[in-house]
Structures are given as C-alpha cells and as structure tokens.
C-alpha cells in the first residue's frame, strides 16, 4: 500500500496540529497518508510554539522561523512605501533564498517525489516553485485564501504585493495540479493562469442525531449557534441590532446566541442573550452546534475584504454541515457562498444589512416546520456528499495523484 503513495514534501505556514484551521486540515491529511511518506516543512512566525500531535510523532517536521512576513513602513507616505520595498527586496529575498535551500536539503534527505506548496503566507508565495525546480520533481499547489486578501492584511507594500501576486501566478502555471476551495477561485485561476485545478474542501464526520430535522420544543428558547473566529463585523453587528430591535425574540420565542471560539469581544447597552462557551475541540463544537436550532454563517460586507469574500470558502460550513442543522448565511451576493448556496440551499441566504430582512429570514426558517425539515434534510445530504469526509479524501487523493484506496481510511 505505502509503495504506491508519493513521498510528499509539504511546505506551508503551519505544521500539522490541533490549533488553527490550517493545522487541523494538515493533521487530518497526515492521519490518512502513510506516515513514512509525508514530510512537513513549516515556515512559522517567530513567536509560534509547536505542539506535536501524538498520533503523528513519527512524521518528520522541520520548523523554520520567518522574517519580514508582515510589512512595515518607516514613513507614512510614498517614501515609506519605497523604503519598505527596499527592505523587502534585500532582507526578505535573502531570507527566502535561505529557506528554499533548507527545504531542498530536507527534501533530498528524504528522497521526495513531489512538493506540495500551501500558498498561505507571504513566505511560501515567495518560495513559489523554486524548491520543486531545485529537486527536479512535480509541483502541487494549494490555495486556501486569495493572496490579494492576506498580503493586504499583513500590510505588505504595494510594490511587493504586485511582485508576489505575479510570483503566485507563475507558481500556479507550473503546478501539476492546483487545489482550490471555491468555484470562483477555480474559474478565475483556470482563466487567468491556465491552472489545472481541483476543488478540495475539508470534511468531517457528521454527528449521530435522530432529531436533526426537528425544531426544539415549542416551549424552549431558539438557539442560534456560531463557532470560530469572528471577522464579519458588519454582518454580526446587523444580527445583534436585528435581535435587539425584536426584543431577542423570534416567532414569540426567546433567542439565545451560542458562541464558541478562542476569543470573543462584545459590548452592549441593551438587552442581550449570548452564551459564550470559549474554545472547544472540533468534536465538542459539532455536538454543541447540533443542539442549536440554526447556525449562523456571516461573511464580511466590508470592501476591504472583497477578495477574501469572493474567493475563499469558510471551513466552518463543513463544521456546520456535520451538525445536520440548517444555516443562516449572511453574506454579500458576490461571495463564493452565494454561488455555492444556489447549488446547495441549506437554510436561508441573506445578502442585506437591513435588520428587518435578517428577522424575516430567521423567522421563515424557525416558524415553518416543513421548510425547516427540508433545509435540515438538505444539510444532512450535503454532510454526506459535497462536504463529507469521504469526498474530502477523494479530492485529496486526486490532488496528489494516488488511488483512493491508498489512503489509510476505514
């Protein structure tokens, strides 16, 4: 079995772990791949603390600290941009070349067959195709978020951004296969870069719950669930305003918003019913969300998040799918979610920041038992289909060019 699996060198901004989403996805992939044939080269922030996963103790992991991953300006004016560009051109490029050499040595040591570049940081984009070219092996590229989004978030100056995005395109063109997360990303990367793409989205096992398609008892509160990082501030503020204006009631029943995540900041001078449960493991989060009536999936309406909203795909939808509960999607019409939702309607889609429209959508979902059951059933179908663990495994096998039965799954 192991002989048919390529010896993979994975280069990305995180090692496999149980912390952030990137760590979890890589961990789940390592757990199904022959452990003696996957090798991880992680370029992490200087303050990052590596916590190995016990089940993956035999996986060879090389941790390298990044420099100049985030931009800076010496002066807040055009001269400042030029100064930052000069610093990047010398210090950053020198450091990237050093990392490429280290990755090549690591790859040669382990007789690598293919390089899998996860283009999720400034550093990995700058490394691009160089490691694969030096090793003389095929290149696989993986894009979770569009570079236009996270390079701007990292305050990379416009000159370096332009150079890095050009580098990104060159890497995709030279890749044997490119894994993307959304239909919008797939369409544009094929058109703009001639990339050979495949959609690859994380999947998890659904919870076993016999009452998924039913609302909670009529004499109980309506619980709206939310898990993960909160960065869709305008959408969240709109939800809070809508519930406040409606006295935190839907269809005459009290509403509780259940929140899970490592950090959560909220303040209100009005009545609010928020249950903050802190950070929970994936399995805990799924069970707690499955006990909610509907789960909330917001995406930013802010123009500064345009690229992320259009091209990225929220991994929390895979988590929500595993619960079997319908979702209230709150996102602009140009988002990747809108295109996905038209094909997979699993609740209510609201593209407005008008509080009245939020209430109308939520009440439609929780007041119509037949509609609620239909949406719940569609969510169960999606959890066992498009966003299933099995489909994730199939997509990954196709991405790396191996047979599905090569993966170590039951």
Feature roles, as predicted:
Residues 353-357, 369-400:
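A charged, aromatic-enriched C-terminal amphipathic alpha-helix characteristic of glycosyltransferases
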Residues 234, 283-290, 295-318, 327-339:
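Nucleotide-sugar-dependent
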């Amino acid at each position: 079995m192991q002989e048919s699996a390529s010896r993979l060198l994975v280069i990305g901004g995180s090692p496999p772990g149980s912390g952030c989403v990137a760590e979890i996805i890589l961990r789940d992939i390592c757990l199904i791949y022959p452990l003696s044939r996957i090798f991880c080269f992680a370029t992490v922030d200087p303050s990052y603390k590596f916590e190995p996963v016990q089940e993956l103790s035999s996986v060879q992991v090389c941790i390298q600290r990044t420099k100049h991953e985030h931009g800076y300006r010496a002066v807040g004016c055009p001269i400042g941009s030029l100064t930052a560009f000069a610093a990047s051109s010398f210090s950053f490029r020198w450091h990237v070349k050093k990392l490429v050499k280290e990755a090549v040595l690591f790859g040669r040591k382990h007789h690598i067959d293919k390089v899998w570049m996860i283009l999720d940081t400034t550093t990995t984009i700058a490394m691009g195709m160089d490691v694969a070219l030096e090793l003389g092996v095929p290149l696989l590229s993986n894009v979770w978020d569009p570079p236009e989004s996270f390079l701007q978030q990292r305050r990379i100056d416009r000159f370096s951004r332009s150079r890095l995005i050009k580098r990104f395109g060159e890497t995709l063109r030279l890749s044997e296969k490119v894994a993307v997360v959304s239909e919008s990303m797939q369409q544009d990367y094929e058109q703009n870069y001639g990339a050979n793409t495949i959609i690859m989205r994380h999947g998890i096992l659904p919870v076993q719950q016999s009452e998924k398609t039913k609302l909670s008892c009529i004499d109980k509160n309506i619980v709206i669930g939310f898990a993960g990082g909160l960065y869709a501030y305008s959408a969240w503020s709109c939800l809070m305003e809508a519930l406040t204006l409606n006295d935190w009631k839907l269809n005459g029943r009290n509403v509780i918003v259940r929140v899970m995540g490592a950090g959560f900041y909220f303040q209100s001078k009005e009545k609010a019913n928020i249950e903050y449960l802190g950070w929970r493991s994936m399995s805990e989060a799924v069970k707690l969300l499955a006990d909610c009536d509907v789960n909330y999936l917001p995406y930013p309406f802010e123009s500064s998040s345009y690229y992320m909203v259009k091209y990225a795909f929220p991994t929390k939808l895979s988590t929500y799918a595993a619960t079997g509960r319908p979702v209230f999607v709150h996102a602009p019409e140009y988002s990747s979610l809108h295109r996905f939702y038209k094909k997979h309607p699993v609740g209510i889609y609201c593209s407005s920041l008008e509080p009245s429209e939020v209430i109308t959508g939520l009440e439609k979902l929780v007041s119509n038992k037949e509609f609620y059951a239909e949406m719940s059933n569609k969510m169960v179908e999606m959890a066992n289909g498009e966003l299933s663990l099995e489909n994730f495994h199939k997509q990954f096998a196709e991405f790396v060019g191996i047979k599905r039965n090569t993966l170590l799954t039951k």
